[in-house]
Regions:
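Glycine/small-residue-rich loop that forms an oxyanion/phosphate-binding "nest" at active or ligand-binding sites
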Residues: 68, 79-118, 122
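Active-site nucleotide/adenylate-binding loops and adjacent lid/helix of ATP-dependent enzymes
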Residues: 4-5, 101-182, 212, 236-252
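Peripheral (often C-terminal) accessory segments that flank ATP-dependent C-N-forming ligase machineries
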Residues: 311-425
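Solvent-exposed alpha-helices and their adjacent loops that cap or buttress functional pockets
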Residues: 21, 36-38, 91, 113-115, ...
Length: 425
């Protein structure tokens, strides 16, 4: 089988490494890929993740049997629709279903209509009305750009002034372009956060092992928000009881709601949850695998990924075997110092054989035989072990085996999870 994966980050590298485990897979193309993914797939760097017509032409010309569309942008732009129309079976939601991530206002309205627990909210298109609402509600309060903003369109404002400044930046200064033309303002929720990725064919939903993301740039959850500095799986806060509650009150109601709206969701539906004192609530939906959660979750998948993906496409997920290991995983992201703000790149990357076997490359390019840094998040290393403590220790050992000039990583990935595990005995 010939496969095509759209995207070029650490998440795509993790997906490709897992797909390669199937002996029927003879070739994987990655569009555009990156210098590190090139070790595991044929990278077609001249075709970007959003260049849908070129992707379709490439798939037809190269006899692609199955495609995986991983990032949010091409999904929102209708990559799955275009490939499916060209006769290429695909993993991922169509454009109508991808709106669950592409518009936060749509997602919030859906939850309100179908009684899916989430934070109280209002949607605004003009700054004065939004600012008046903030004055009335007070702080802390959350301001979100309605559209896609690379995971950076959310401001958790501690003061009224900070919230109003965020609104003005989004609506008036167009910090996120059209994505911030509408803003969602919602109540601040407190509690542990949990990420749950799931496979769904629109009827059946199978949750993957839970995970904990680390979004802030600095230790102790300080500093600006990033795309994610590391992840552990499973999440110790996510007990069997909470999982059952989420399945009944959030997961199944969501896919039923999407069906009822004429937008059946097939692919990976990501639930960003907060475990509040009044129960689990939805923080956000993503219409695809999370990054770096995927790099912690997929190494724990015991079943064949390609078979499970095809079952979501074919509507046969109810008959598929989806099994996860009871081990723990920890992914530590190595970034360029200064990320997510200003950073330098173009530095040579060296890594031990052991680290190379467990790494997922995100921001790197090849210059002849040398791998060079080419992004904020450069790569992630993942360790799997029988205990979370061992997985965390092993992941940091792997991180020591990678070197580049301005290497930076958080030193506390998994610390909160370990504390929670000890607290719960």
């Amino acid at each position: 089988m010939k496969l095509m994966v759209i995207g070029g980050g650490g998440r795509e590298h993790a997906i490709i490494k897992k797909l390669k485990e199937n002996p029927a897979v003879e070739k994987i193309y990655c569009l555009p890929g990156n210098g590190g993914i090139a070790a595991d797939a044929v990278c077609v760097s001249e075709i970007g993740a959003k260049d849908i017509p070129a992707q379709v032409e490439f798939a037809k010309a190269h006899g692609i049997d199955y495609a995986v569309v991983a990032p949010d942008d091409p999904l929102a732009l209708g990559a799955v629709d275009a490939l499916s129309e060209a006769g290429i079976p695909c993993f991922g939601p169509d454009k109508k279903a991808a709106v669950i991530e592409a518009s936060k206002a749509f997602a919030k309205d859906l939850m309100q209509k179908y009684n899916i627990p989430t934070a109280k909210y209002r949607v605004f298109t003009d700054a004065p009305s939004a600012c008046a609402y903030i004055d009335a509600e007070g702080a802390p309060i959350v301001v979100k750009a309605d559209g896609l903003a690379l995971g950076k369109g959310v401001v958790v404002a501690q003061t009224v002034e900070e919230a109003k400044a965020a609104v003005r930046a989004m609506i008036e200064d167009k910090t996120f372009g059209q994505s911030g033309a509408r803003v969602v303002i919602e109540e601040y929720m407190e509690g542990p956060e949990v990420s749950v990725l799931s496979f769904t064919d629109g009827e059946t939903l199978v949750p993957m092992v839970s995970s904990m993301d680390h979004k802030r740039a600095l230790d102790g959850d300080k500093g600006p928000n990033t795309g994610g500095m590391g992840a552990v799986a499973p999440n110790p806060y996510y007990t069997k009881e909470i999982a059952a509650e989420c399945m009944e009150n959030i997961f199944l109601p969501t896919i039923r709601a999407m069906r009822a709206e004429g937008r059946p969701f097939r692919g990976c539906l990501y639930f960003g949850l907060m475990l509040t004192k009044s129960g689990p609530k939805v923080v956000e939906y993503n219409c695809r695998f999370g990054d770096p959660e995927t790099q912690a979750v997929l190494p724990l998948l015991k079943s064949d990924l390609l078979t499970v993906m095809q079952a979501t496409t074919n509507g046969t997920l109810a008959d598929a075997s989806v099994e996860f290991s009871t081990d723990s995983a920890c992914c530590v992201v190595l970034a360029s110092e200064g990320y997510p703000q200003k950073y330098e790149s173009g530095f040579p990357i060296t890594m031990s054989e052991e680290a190379a076997a467990h790494c997922y490359v995100a921001g790197a390019k090849k210059d002849s035989d040398t791998l060079l840094t080419a992004g904020g998040r450069v790569l992630g290393v993942t360790a799997v072990a029988p205990t979370l403590r061992a997985a965390v220790e092993d992941a940091y050992h792997l991180a020591e085996g990678v070197d580049f000039a301005n290497k930076y990583c958080r030193g506390d990935i998994g610390r909160a999870a370990l504390a929670a595990r000890e607290e719960r005995g």
